[in-house]
């Protein structure tokens, strides 16, 4: 079970890293990846892979949706940690995005993640 979960975490993180590595290098990419990739159990991704396997959905399609869901989840966590919300200093054992970069950068990075999700899904749908 743990081995399968680790594989899903690695597969999802690698997919997201490759996607963001192909994007134009802006000042937001680093804080977006910081809030998105390290740590986290990717439970949502595992649930999607489990449901997809039940209904025999192509794993590449599941991976695209899982990556999109992780973008939305990371957005919610980045915003939840902000001073106007919970004002947390740590997330997953490391500085929160607003503590590592700045509050305004965290807001913009968080806001950019759902947009990236939309672009990711549209790009994959059109390309494949």
State where each predicted segment sits.
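Short glycine/serine- and small hydrophobic-enriched flexible loop segments
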Residues: 49-53, 73, 115, 119-120
């Amino acid at each position: 079970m743990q081995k399968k979960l680790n594989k899903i975490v690695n597969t999802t993180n690698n997919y997201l890293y490759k996607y963001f590595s192909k994007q134009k290098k802006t000042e937001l990419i680093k804080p977006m990846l910081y809030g998105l990739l390290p740590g986290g159990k990717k439970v949502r991704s595992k649930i999607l892979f489990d449901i997809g396997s039940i209904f025999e959905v192509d794993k590449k399609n599941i991976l695209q949706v899982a990556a999109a869901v992780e973008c939305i989840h990371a957005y919610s966590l980045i915003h939840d940690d902000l001073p106007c919300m919970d004002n947390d200093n740590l997330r997953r054992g490391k500085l929160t995005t607003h503590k590592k970069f700045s509050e305004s950068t965290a807001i913009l990075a968080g806001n950019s993640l759902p947009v990236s999700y939309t672009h990711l899904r549209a790009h994959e749908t059109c390309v494949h």
